[in-house]
Amino acid sequence: MIQKLKAKGFTYNATLDMLEGEFNGQPVRVTVVTDNNKVYRICLIDENNCSESQIKIRFNTLCRQFENNKKYLPMKDNQEISESEDISYEMLVHKKEYQAGFYQIGPEGTTSFLDKSLEELEQISKKVVWFTIGDHYGQYYIIMYYDNYNNQANGEDL
């Protein structure tokens, strides 16, 4: 997976022990998490922080991009943040977390999704992408995860 990311232009930063590059038009840092040489998580972290109003726009734009992509199915309806939401207050005072999640249903999209068996639907639920807002001293950034629970440790080494 790391070689595939390098082929897409990502470069290794030895100081951070992460890959760096551009994803969806934004500079990001990437970590790849494996278990028994199988990738079960790819984590992308925005390299640049932004203001509260900018992060709302970025978060909502990502929600719309995933909702409009036939390869993904939203985990719940309307995951966008309202314009009136005071993110800084909610995160600081109420420890609120802003997250959006989508199932990866494959290149065939939702049309054949309805024809899937229960077993196939269970497999779809094990491949998700989700993102959240991180905070660093009043500046915000997106952390995005691509998870494949099929490759995650489930206690088999215990």
Model segments located where?
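Start-of-domain marker
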Residues: 1-27
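Non-cytosolic coordination micro-motifs
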Residues: 2-12, 48-158
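A generic structural signal for beta-strand entry/edge sites
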Residues: 16-18, 37-39, 137-141
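Mid-chain, structured segments of secreted extracytoplasmic proteins
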Residues: 23-65
